[in-house]
């Protein structure tokens, strides 16, 4: 069978398919035309998230996201849902540490109505007090759900340990205390500060006409008198190593091991992505094979790489029987040491590259993924990043680059370890971590 080779340039990746317009007030409008599809994915993004919140504001970005679908000057919450359902549209929103997005996907012929609904949600939310009280209770339940889900709760505990004095280490949801204090004044003040033109990005991907898109959104954003604010600058996150063990009566112990990693703009991020794939990013990865397939010590075990604008986190997660905790830690450390000492073949690296590249191209066939990718690249690089440019950067990574990355990430004293389950710190073999800390 002949080997399949990706075409040098797919028709929908030509630069002319990607357009960008900057309005007079700084709002950016970006489109990626995919003429082979019938759908359009549209997102209105704000370059703000939980890392921009003060301790008292923690969770306000997420609260705003929830409230935006509850009603506007022109539509009730029910009317928003009814209008979307009437055109077979899918719509949602999400809040991250650095961005907030309100998005939807419809047939291309229904794009004008989706644009009208999302811009109405974004520009004219009402934030009625009775709606706020109901949604506050919903968010309380969301917080409780996370705290009742061990791996999610451990993730929160780990981030507090890793970024102890920075908002990036706090929960996107906020806490019961901060959410309980939020009112209309706090929400409107946050919007005034951060929902400003230079932080706003409108992105569409699919069978969309850029000129018509600009024609619609220009009057929406250039004529709104309340669309201005302060634009506070972000502070650089400082990381912390250490140990945090939280005792809880569970069947398993859940483990997080993590350290500093490259940011979105660091050239070494490609080596880190490949290191992640090789160590614990798929079913043939070293941790999955050794811990799950060969030893049967865990059902869920993986590594992850989370880059941000100016920092990053590389981590390993496993859920295991408390009796096997130290064995899992020892295997994890051994596999990391093997890579940091050069035990990586050219064929293994080539397979990891193909895995990453293949995954990128597979997701490129979704208009939602294309829209989100275009937004990320505009926020980070202020331009469209061609797929071939990414492939070339991945292909340039050498065995030595991955080996150096493994050593850089886990070869210092900023390693953080968090565990949740029926254990205490005395149960952890700290020698496997080369760390010391205080249990809680």
Model-found features: residue ranges?
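A conserved active-site cap/scaffold subdomain adjacent to cofactor or substrate pockets
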Residues: 264-267, 271-281, 287
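A short acidic-to-branched-hydrophobic micro-motif
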Residues: 42-46, 118, 255
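N- or domain-start disorder-to-order transition segments that initiate the globular core
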Residues: 4-39
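Catalytic cores of enzymes that engage adenine nucleotides and/or redox cofactors via long glycine-rich
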Residues: 236-239, 290
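M16/MPP (pitrilysin/insulinase) zinc-metallopeptidase core fold and M16-derived inactive scaffolds
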Residues: 41-105, 281-297, 308
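Charge-rich, well-structured scaffold segments of protease-associated domains
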Residues: 2-7, 22, 33, 77-229, ...
């Amino acid at each position: 069978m002949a080997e399949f080779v990706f075409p040098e340039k797919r028709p929908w990746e030509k630069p002319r398919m990607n357009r960008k317009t900057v309005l007079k007030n700084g709002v950016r409008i970006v489109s990626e035309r995919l003429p082979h599809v019938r759908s359009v994915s549209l997102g209105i993004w704000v370059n703000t998230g939980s890392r921009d919140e003060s301790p008292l504001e923690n969770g306000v970005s997420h609260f705003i996201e929830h409230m935006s679908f509850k009603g506007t000057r022109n539509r009730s919450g029910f009317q928003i849902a009814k209008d979307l359902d009437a055109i077979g549209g899918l719509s949602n929103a999400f809040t991250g540490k650095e961005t907030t997005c309100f998005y939807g996907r419809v047939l291309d012929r229904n794009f004008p109505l989706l644009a009208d609904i999302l811009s109405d949600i974004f520009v004219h939310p009402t934030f009625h007090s009775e709606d706020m009280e109901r949604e506050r209770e919903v968010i309380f339940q969301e917080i409780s759900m996370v705290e009742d889900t061990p791996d999610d709760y451990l993730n929160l505990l780990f981030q507090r340990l890793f970024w102890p004095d920075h908002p990036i280490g706090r929960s996107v949801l906020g806490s019961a205390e901060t959410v309980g204090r939020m009112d209309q004044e706090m929400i409107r003040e946050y919007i005034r500060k951060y929902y400003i033109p230079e932080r706003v990005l409108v992105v569409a991907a699919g069978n969309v006409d850029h000129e018509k898109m600009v024609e619609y959104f220009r009057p929406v954003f250039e004529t709104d008198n309340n669309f201005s604010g302060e634009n506070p600058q972000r502070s650089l996150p400082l990381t912390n190593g250490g140990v945090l063990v939280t005792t809880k009566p569970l069947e398993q112990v859940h483990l997080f091991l993590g350290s500093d990693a490259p940011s979105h703009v660091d050239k070494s991020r490609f080596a880190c992505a490949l290191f992640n794939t090789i160590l614990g990013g798929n079913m043939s990865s070293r941790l999955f094979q050794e811990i799950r397939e060969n030893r049967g010590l865990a059902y869920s075990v993986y590594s992850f790489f989370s880059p941000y604008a100016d920092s990053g986190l590389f981590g390993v997660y496993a859920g295991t029987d408390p009796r096997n905790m130290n064995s899992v830690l020892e295997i994890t450390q051994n596999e990391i040491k093997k890579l940091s000492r050069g035990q990586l073949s050219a064929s293994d690296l080539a397979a990891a590259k193909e895995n990453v590249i293949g995954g990128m191209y597979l997701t490129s066939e979704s208009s939602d993924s294309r829209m989100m990718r275009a937004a990320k690249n505009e926020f980070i690089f202020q331009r469209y990043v061609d797929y071939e440019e990414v492939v070339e950067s991945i292909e340039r990574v050498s065995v030595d680059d991955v080996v150096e990355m493994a050593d850089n990430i886990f070869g210092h004293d900023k390693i953080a370890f968090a565990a949740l389950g029926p254990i205490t710190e005395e149960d952890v073999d700290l020698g496997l971590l080369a760390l010391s800390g205080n249990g809680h």
